[in-house]
């Protein structure tokens, strides 16, 4: 079974979000997503200073098997991107929740995360897909 962390929020498209102590929201793809994709070879993130919107495409992750859009769990301004992924995209495979995050957003309204799936709801989604 995939690693599903209790403190995170999830989308059915397999992205996760974590609210940081400074109020920003970090976004990446789940352990299930990286496993399904296989070896990640390229990550395209939004630019710092750009705006992302809840549920809209914000980037792309490519693997040896497929390419997949990355969606944001909140609307807001991108305040950081994970530069490590430019030179080491495989970090998404080895550490999807820690070193393999994609970008950070200063959310317009953090309560948008209330619409996202809890860890238990995400687990149920994965079980229903099996």
From Swiss-Prot:
Domain of life where this protein originates: Bacteria
Subunit record text: The glycine cleavage system is composed of four proteins: P, T, L and H.
Name of the encoding gene: gcvH
This protein's name: Glycine cleavage system H protein
Keyword tRNA processing included in the entry's annotation: no
Domain Lipoyl-binding, residue spans: 24-106
Cofactor(s) needed for function: (R)-lipoate
PANTHER family recorded: GLYCINE CLEAVAGE SYSTEM H PROTEIN (PTHR11715), GLYCINE CLEAVAGE SYSTEM H PROTEIN-RELATED (PTHR11715:SF3)
Keyword vocabulary terms for this entry: Lipoyl
Residues recorded with modification N6-lipoyllysine: 65
Record note on cofactor: Binds 1 lipoyl cofactor covalently.
